């Protein structure tokens, strides 16, 4: 019977045999995997890097700062659950651990970037030089209160309206200074008298 089929229909059988023996990588495979859209590519790469990288993290980019730090009007900034909601929604963490503190700022990126060209002032946590905003900015300070690993992180949310202190770094691709970290959001009533003789804003240790 098999000999008869081979004799009568040699070509179709050869094609079928070739298909069966063809390496898997050359066959068409239908999958349900969804690859990241173009506007999600950086976020996907950042997620992979945080969990699988063993080297130093990449410096922050414009899109990362916009996504993780800058906020739009919506939930009231004085809401008790603001930080818990936003930190989880914006995936603010380092590898699989909670961040000890974080700031959300109600401002545009261009306004934040301009601060990089303001005068230097002292800042907290042993950092010698920060750039300070000229005007007051609304934001939320998030302070870790419970747990150390995601997703159990719990934060205290503190509304602030004050001067933003940031550090900046030079980005070769853009040939510009860009915001690197938010060091503090200093409310003026508490530090109103801390001005040096030349008008430089000074924060006590």
From Swiss-Prot:
Q: Which Pfam families is this protein grouped with?
A: RnaseA (PF00074)
What SUPFAM superfamilies would the database entry show?
A: RNase A-like
Q: Does the keyword Transmembrane helix apply?
A: no
What cystine pairs are annotated?
A: 98-153, 116-168, 123-130
GO terms (molecular function) for this protein are: nucleic acid binding
Q: What does this protein do?
A: Does not exhibit any ribonuclease activity.
SMART domains linked to this entry: RNAse_Pc
Q: Which residues are glycosylated?
A: 131, 143
Q: What is this protein called?
A: Inactive ribonuclease-like protein 9
Subcellular location as annotated: Secreted
Biological process, per Gene Ontology = defense response to Gram-positive bacterium
- Signal peptide location: 1-26
Instruction: State the gene name recorded for this protein.
Output: RNASE9
By sequence similarity, the record places it as follows:
Belongs to the pancreatic ribonuclease family.
Q: Which UniProt keywords apply?
A: Disulfide bond, Glycoprotein, Secreted, Signal
Q: Which InterPro entries match?
A: RNaseA, RNaseA-like_dom_sf, RNaseA_domain
Q: Name one GO cellular component term.
A: extracellular region
**Does the entry feature the keyword Secreted, yes or no?**
yes
- Organism, scientific name: Gorilla gorilla gorilla (Western lowland gorilla)
């Amino acid at each position: 019977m098999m000999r008869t089929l081979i004799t009568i229909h040699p070509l179709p059988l050869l094609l079928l045999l070739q298909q069966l023996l063809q390496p898997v990588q050359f066959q068409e495979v239908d999958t349900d995997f969804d690859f990241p859209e173009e506007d999600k590519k950086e976020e996907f790469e950042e997620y992979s890097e945080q969990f699988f990288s063993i080297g130093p993290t990449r410096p922050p980019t414009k899109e990362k700062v916009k996504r993780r730090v800058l906020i739009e009007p919506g939930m009231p900034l004085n809401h008790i659950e603001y930080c818990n909601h936003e930190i989880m929604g914006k995936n603010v963490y380092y590898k699989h651990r909670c961040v000890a503190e974080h700031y959300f700022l109600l401002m545009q990126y261009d306004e934040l970037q301009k601060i990089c060209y303001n005068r230097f002032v002292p800042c907290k946590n042993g950092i010698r030089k920060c750039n300070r905003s000229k005007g007051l900015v609304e934001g939320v300070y998030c302070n870790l209160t419970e747990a150390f690993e995601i997703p159990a992180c719990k934060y205290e949310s503190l509304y602030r309206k004050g001067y933003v202190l940031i550090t900046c770094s030079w980005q070769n691709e853009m040939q510009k200074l860009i915001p690197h970290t938010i060091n503090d959001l200093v409310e003026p009533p508490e530090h109103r008298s801390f001005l040096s003789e030349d008008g430089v804003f000074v924060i006590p240790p």
